[in-house]
């Protein structure tokens, strides 16, 4: 009787092994039925797979151990590479359903966890560092990000905290940015998923790097950029996402005004000036209209003899009209003539600093 019992027990334990059938990958046809599901059939008979089967990809030392129903994944699912379990989860009627675990193909350590419902991400998904600490955490509701999105440094320091609702960013978004400067960035999103409200990026020691604001996803109002020292580097003005108004930039370290001009619809419009970085004195001045030079342009020319100002006339971006150059020292005329479509034309004259005619010629 004992011998009969042992035989029965052996057959009972061995049943799953006999029930499980192995297929090589080229013995199975896989059809995408169009709704994200895969239909598995025996290649020769075209019969849908049912029960637990092992599908082997001998070329890559990989295989899948999964349960099937009417040709679709249904039940437990495991994927191996070089006998290391790299994916484990479950399906329901061909769709991922429940917790999926993704492991490293090198050492089998847990890399990711994802929760599914009816084939869509639903619940908390996590990724892990090789140490086992959480690297990131995201929350979903039926395929759309919903809730907090968190990411961490390997030492556990929070790097990102974003908030989502039905797939859109909403509310306060915090990010730790690493680059030339390490910065803490904070921006706000409205219920429609657009940036809206105050924006700031701040140095790790607490001083601001950039301060500004958004309105319905577009930059709006004054934006200011600062140096690590706290000095202002740039002031910009925006309207509906386009630069519109005064733009001023300053030299880092000295704080000397470098450039100032006006913008309209992202194009220079109005007075434009540049300054000497050493002493802050004006060295260039022009007028723009709709992004093109239009009107007078003055440019300081520094010479090893005598510095002088050149004054040109522009019409719709082309140099047209009278030209003159005057010495800085005594405002005496240095050179005069005329331009037409960017070329010198007509009679030109040049004078010495004491007012004597030095040269006179014609330009073709």
Q: Locations of the language-model features?
A:
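Bacterial Sec-dependent N-terminal signal peptides
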Residues: 1-23
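Glycine/tyrosine- and acidic-biased, solvent-exposed loop/turn segments at the edges of beta-strands
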Residues: 18-364
């Amino acid at each position: 009787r004992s011998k009969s019992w042992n035989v029965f027990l052996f057959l009972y334990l061995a049943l799953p092994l006999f029930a499980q059938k192995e297929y090589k990958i080229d013995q199975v046809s896989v059809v995408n039925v169009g709704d994200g599901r895969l239909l598995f059939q025996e290649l020769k008979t075209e019969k849908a797979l049912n029960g637990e089967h092992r599908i082997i990809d001998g070329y890559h030392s990989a295989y899948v151990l999964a349960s099937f129903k009417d040709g679709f994944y249904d039940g437990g699912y495991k994927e191996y590479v070089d006998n290391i379990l790299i994916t484990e989860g479950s399906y329901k009627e061909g769709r991922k359903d429940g917790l999926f675990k993704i492991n490293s193909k090198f050492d089998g350590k847990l890399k990711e966890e994802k929760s599914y419902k009816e084939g869509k991400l639903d619940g908390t998904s996590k990724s892990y560092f090789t140490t086992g600490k959480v690297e990131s955490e995201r929350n979903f509701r039926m395929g759309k990000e919903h809730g907090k999105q968190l990411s961490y440094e390997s030492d556990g320091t929070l790097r990102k905290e974003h908030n989502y609702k039905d797939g859109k960013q909403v509310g306060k978004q915090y990010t730790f940015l690493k680059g030339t400067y390490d910065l803490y960035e904070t921006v706000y999103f409205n219920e429609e998923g657009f940036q809206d409200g105050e924006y700031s990026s701040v140095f790790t020691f607490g001083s601001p790097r950039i301060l500004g604001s958004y309105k319905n996803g577009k930059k709006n109002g004054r934006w200011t950029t600062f140096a690590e020292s706290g000095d202002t580097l740039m002031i910009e003005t925006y309207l509906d996402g386009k630069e519109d108004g005064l733009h001023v930039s300053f030299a880092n370290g000295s704080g000397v005004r470098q450039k100032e001009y006006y913008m309209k619809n992202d194009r220079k419009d109005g007075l434009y000036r540049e300054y000497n970085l050493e002493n802050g004195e004006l060295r260039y001045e022009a007028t723009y209209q709709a992004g093109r030079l239009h009107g007078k342009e003055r440019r300081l020319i520094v010479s090893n003899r005598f510095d002088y100002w050149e004054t040109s006339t522009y019409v719709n971006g082309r140099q047209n009209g009278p030209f003159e150059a005057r010495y800085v020292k005594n405002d005496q005329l240095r050179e005069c003539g005329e331009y037409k479509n960017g070329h010198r034309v007509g009679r030109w004259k040049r004078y010495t600093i004491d007012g004597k005619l030095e040269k006179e010629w014609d330009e073709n």
